[in-house]
Amino acid sequence: MKYLSIKSASDKIKSGLLKTGVILSFSLFSSLSTAAFEVVALGVDGGVSDGNLTSYLIRNDSQPLYLGLDAGSVLPGIARALEKGHFAAITDAMAAPLTRQGYIFRQSINSYFISHAHLDHVSGLIIGSPDDSKKTIYASADTIDVLRNYYFNWRVWPNFTDSGSGARLGTYRMQVVRPAQSLSLGLTRLTGEMYPLSHDKSPSSMLLISSNNEFFAYFGDTGPDDVEKSKNLDTVWRKLAEKVTQQQLKGMIIEVSYPNDVADNKLFGHMTPTWLLKELKKLEQYSGEGQPLKGLPVVISHIKPSFQQGQDVRKLILSELQQGNDMGIEFILMEQGDSQKFQ
């Protein structure tokens, strides 16, 4: 399958109408197109920078409510997105008596999916919990166990959940998700299926999000199958290949934490560009002949900042990905506060 931009598709349709002499308002075709996934990057780094840790929002852009995808840095990301002019539909009058940032945090984010319980994926959730509104937290049994017993336990932090030790303040309803279980995600009009990932000594997970029979894949931290001695990614690629062949996969977010000069025994459950390209080759293989992934948007997340003088690690990783990219994939680096549509 070739992933065709909306503009390219529009131009081809217009050209065809002119050639056949059919006169028809193009707005009709626009109205027939399906809604897009909107993704807002609240945090994109893989550690160190505590104000810019992994967290994204996603919604069907015809719906007002977002699903949070991890929650490393939430409020700083909302503030940055507002500075960049996003969330324009949420005005001061609409948000009152809250600030726009507060309204988005409390009202627009309807629920969260947490891929795993490492601090760089949950610290924003924990810190923000005293001022949050009631929400459902979707996660694996292991992740729920860590959140309940090691964070929200009245020793590290008050228990803002509906289970666990001590008084239960009940802000967050903890919902265990079983592998491959299909479930509705709060009031977002999104549905999802979770698949296990291998992240060194910690289990992680991928969420396959769907809306109107279109799909978007969000990966928590993961190492390559060969290094992790796992088949988890292979299972995921076979699942995603079904969506590629049906032209239903609109994009994905996946990690590359380190550049290629990091040895396999120093990855600790993460990816390099070479390893991600090898893994995506499996998806290509399972998806059919030709270049089935051509034009597929792949957002690279969780890049770990470097303290080395003169090294732009984000630029380096993108360059290494592009050098080995013979699949026609569109690799994307989102910055904190960016918003992008996938359709």
Curated annotation (Swiss-Prot):
Signal sequence, renumbered to the chain: 1-36
Biological processes, Gene Ontology terms: cAMP catabolic process; negative regulation of glucose mediated signaling pathway
GO cellular component terms, semicolon-separated: periplasmic space
CDD domains: class_II_PDE_MBL-fold (cd07735)
Keyword Hydrolase: yes
Pfam families cross-referenced by the UniProt entry: PDEase_II (PF02112)
InterPro entries: cAMP-PdiesteraseII_CS, Pdiesterase2, RibonucZ/Hydroxyglut_hydro
Domain of life: Bacteria
Single Gene Ontology MF annotation: 3',5'-cyclic-AMP phosphodiesterase activity
Catalytic activity: a nucleoside 3',5'-cyclic phosphate + H2O = a nucleoside 5'-phosphate + H(+)
EC numbers on record: 3.1.4.17
Keywords from the named record: cAMP, Hydrolase, Periplasm, Signal
Localization per record: Periplasm
Similarity-based family: Belongs to the cyclic nucleotide phosphodiesterase class-II family.
Protein's name according to its UniProt entry: Probable 3',5'-cyclic-nucleotide phosphodiesterase
